[in-house]
């Protein structure tokens, strides 16, 4: 549980497993390098059953699994012995702060009593604050960045793929005449993600698709998936109200030179966004403990929700593959019927007039099947290019929020409680020194400086803790807007089915009408 108000948050619990334990059921297998493998994503441990269906043979699950593995293992987020895991976030409540610690801004300490705040969660001020954040984010906005794969691969020994990245609208804080097309490679996208994680660790930074899965880095289907994943990544970044304003994001999208060379020469800022910031006391007055409870509940259920949506997306992909097979089989059926009609004349030489009439209608059936195959092909393409992308984008959004929660557990710690205790002890020593004439002045001054330094550190850490709290609330508020992605994707799904179902029905009605004249007897 991500309890921001708990004094024992950082005690080790079952959720903070080491990589070996957390990924015990996510072992690489030879099937990982093929597109026929079991779901072994971090939340879909084994081949999962869904009613009478077993969710196996899914390259999407491999993509999600590798993405999450990169997120947690390669970044070593669960590195044993991380000091922050044993620290508290908010320190002791005000009742435990020594009143003699002058100069400490205790107004930023966690408030034990909420009597001075609004009793109801959705107070008018808090609601206005949230509404102002909601208006900055529209997850249903159209993509404004296009990523296309350049066919020619570069490199002498190790070939790599380049991508043409084009933004379709004028970007914030850029000249309208800025270059709208740049060439980037996967490592450039990776660099952008890493600097965003350094600067904005408590923002919803989307994950990148895996660089490769087994030996699939040269597989055209895998490369197509990776290109789509990169496109989703950069569009989620540019939709984010804070990330889209970042200078390095704009550099990534506008600087026409090789980004690797630019990084070696340029001096760019990667300091955390909270540097030199002070928490607005108006926000502190808005805070309500129930907000922490909501986060904790979301954190407890996010894996379940992610698992369910992955299953949904897998089934959508499976439906797409079935449509491809249906389309091919309809064309095949049309050809087989044509062959039958060509050969049937030899079986009915005495009834040539009738059999020719029948065969002409059979030709109509063949054309109808080809028309249905074209309809199935269009539907499959629409699923692949639009619907499936929307399902996967929502996966990316959920994983981005999960990343915020997980990074909070690792990176938001402080040692306020330890510093408070040390200040109290040193204050007692200082008082005893004042009554002892034998104590040297240098020792007294040194202890007083230590107390003052610890007080400043406590104030700084309290300030940072509140800034983190505000940042995560902003992210959680704008995340609420993504609930409409669920509505949108299912509306689009139903609309698509109605469209192609109507086309299919009309086609069958036409062929049925034509077949009414097909001979049933000699009369």
UniProtKB/Swiss-Prot annotation:
Annotated a 1,2-diacyl-sn-glycero-3-phospho-(1D-myo-inositol-3-phosphate) binding sites: 185, 187, 211, 226
Main location: cytoplasm
SMART domains, A to Z: PX
Entry's localization field: Cytoplasm; Membrane
Limits of the PX domain: 141-260
Region (Disordered): 1-37
Gene Ontology biological process terms in this record: plasma membrane tubulation; protein targeting to vacuole; retrograde transport, endosome to Golgi
Disulphides: none
Biased composition (Polar residues): 17-37
GO molecular function (one): phosphatidylinositol-3-phosphate binding
Listed InterPro entries: AH/BAR_dom_sf, PX_dom, PX_dom_sf, SNX8/Mvp1, SNX8/Mvp1_PX, Snx8_BAR_dom
Bilayer topology term: Peripheral membrane protein
Domains (record comment): The PX domain binds phosphatidylinositol 3-phosphate which is necessary for peripheral membrane localization.
Family of this protein: Belongs to the sorting nexin family.
Descriptive protein name: Sorting nexin MVP1
Species assigned in the record: Eremothecium gossypii (strain ATCC 10895 / CBS 109.51 / FGSC 9923 / NRRL Y-1056)
Gene symbol of the encoding locus: MVP1
């Amino acid at each position: 549980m991500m309890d921001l108000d708990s004094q024992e948050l950082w005690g080790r619990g079952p959720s903070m497993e080491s990589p070996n334990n957390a990924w015990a059921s996510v072992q690489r297998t030879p099937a990982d390098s093929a597109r026929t493998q079991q779901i072994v994503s971090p939340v879909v441990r084994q081949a999962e059953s869904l009613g009478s269906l077993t969710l196996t043979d899914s390259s999407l699950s491999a993509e999600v699994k590798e993405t999450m593995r990169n997120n947690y293992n390669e970044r070593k987020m669960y590195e044993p012995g991380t000091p922050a895991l044993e620290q508290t976030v908010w320190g002791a409540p005000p009742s435990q702060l020594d009143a003699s610690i002058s100069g400490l801004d205790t107004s930023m300490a966690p408030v034990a009593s909420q009597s001075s705040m609004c009793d109801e969660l959705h107070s008018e001020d808090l609601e206005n604050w949230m509404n102002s954040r909601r208006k900055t984010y529209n997850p249903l906005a159209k993509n404004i960045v296009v990523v296309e794969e350049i066919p020619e691969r570069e490199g002498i020994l190790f070939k790599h793929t380049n991508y043409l990245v084009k933004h379709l609208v004028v970007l914030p804080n850029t000249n309208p005449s800025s270059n709208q097309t740049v060439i980037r490679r996967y490592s450039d996208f990776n660099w952008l993600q890493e600097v965003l994680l350094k600067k904005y660790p408590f923002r919803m930074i989307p994950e990148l698709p895996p660089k490769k899965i087994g030996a699939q880095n040269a597989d055209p289907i895998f490369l197509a998936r990776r290109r789509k994943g990169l496109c989703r990544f950069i569009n989620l970044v540019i939709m984010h109200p804070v990330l889209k304003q970042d200078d390095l994001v704009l550099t990534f999208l506008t600087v026409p030179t090789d980004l690797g060379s630019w990084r070696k020469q340029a001096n760019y800022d990667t300091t955390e966004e909270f540097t030199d910031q002070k928490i607005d006391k108006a926000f502190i007055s808005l805070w309500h403990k129930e907000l922490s409870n909501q986060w904790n509940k979301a954190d407890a259920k996010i894996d379940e929700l992610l698992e369910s949506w992955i299953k949904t997306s897998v089934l959508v992909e499976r439906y797409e593959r079935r449509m491809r097979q249906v389309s091919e089989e309809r064309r095949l059926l049309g050809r087989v019927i044509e062959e039958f009609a060509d050969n049937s004349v030899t079986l009915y030489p005495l009834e040539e007039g009738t059999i020719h009439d029948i065969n002409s209608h059979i030709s109509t059936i063949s054309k109808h099947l080809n028309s249905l195959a074209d309809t199935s092909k269009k539907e499959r393409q629409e699923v692949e290019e639009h619907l499936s992308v929307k399902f996967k984008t929502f996966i990316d959004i959920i994983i981005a929020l999960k990343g915020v929660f997980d990074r909070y557990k690792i990176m938001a710690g402080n040692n306020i409680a330890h510093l408070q205790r040390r200040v109290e002890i040193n204050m007692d020593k200082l008082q005893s020194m004042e009554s002892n004439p034998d104590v040297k002045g240098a020792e007294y001054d040194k202890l007083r400086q230590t107390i003052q330094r610890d007080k400043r550190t406590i104030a700084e850490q309290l300030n940072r803790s509140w800034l983190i709290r505000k940042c995560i609330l902003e992210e959680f508020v704008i995340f609420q807007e993504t609930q409409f992605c669920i509505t949108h994707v299912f509306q689009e799904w139903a609309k698509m089915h109605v469209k192609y179902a109507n086309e299919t029905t009309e086609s069958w009605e036409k062929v049925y009408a034509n077949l009414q004249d097909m001979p049933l007897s000699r009369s």
